[in-house]
Design a protein with these regions (language model features):
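A small/polar active-site loop signature that marks catalytic segments
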Residues: 1-110
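C-terminal soluble interaction/assembly domains
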Residues: 62-65, 74-174
Length: 174
């Protein structure tokens, strides 16, 4: 049936690295949610039928499997959705550092690092850490909600060592 169909239109997606960069640099969390849904769509296509499981749940299960493979226990990272804005999304600083350390060892590590906001240069960190050793050195994702402020990413030490870090402030009032 589809062999005889006419294509009425086509929309091509930007490359994954551009989607990731748009999501991370400016904290466009809907882009990041859509990446989780894309993973979930692929996972559901590969899964045996098991009743109704949403695309989001398939994506969360895939992410949970990756975290377990890295050695992050379920109690250290609870994923409720892909934006990080839900109160059901919980992660310890240690879990984030373990994930960042794992990602730093992957072939796409440099692409990911460049997709993160850079202190004093661009994205959500453009106005932060200027005229400090962190400027143009810290590559990190920001995250904030009422009374919650987080920063997780990479920094290069004065000795040239690349470090993963996560800073989380809860019940923080400016």
């Amino acid at each position: 049936l589809l062999r005889h169909a006419d294509v009425l239109g086509e929309v091509l997606s930007p490359p994954l690295w551009q989607i990731l960069q748009r999501g991370l640099k400016r904290s466009q969390n809907l882009y990041l949610q859509n990446l989780l849904l894309s993973v979930g769509a692929q996972a559901s296509a590969d899964a045996a039928p098991a009743g109704f499981i949403s695309t989001q749940d398939h994506g969360i299960k895939a992410l949970d499997r990756l975290l377990a493979q890295i050695g992050i226990p379920p109690s250290a990272a609870l994923i409720g959705e892909g934006t990080g804005l839900s109160r059901r999304d919980l992660a310890t600083p240690d879990a984030l550092v373990r994930l960042l350390t794992y990602l730093a060892a992957q072939p796409y590590a440099q692409t990911l690092r460049q997709a993160l906001p850079i202190a004093g240069v661009d994205g959500t960190l453009i106005g932060h850490m200027r005229r400090t050793a962190a400027e143009n050195n810290v590559h990190a994702k920001t995250g904030s909600m009422t009374y919650v402020h987080c920063l997780a990413g990479y920094v290069t030490s004065a000795a040239g060592e690349r470090l993963a870090f996560a800073i989380m402030l809860n019940n923080y009032q400016r």
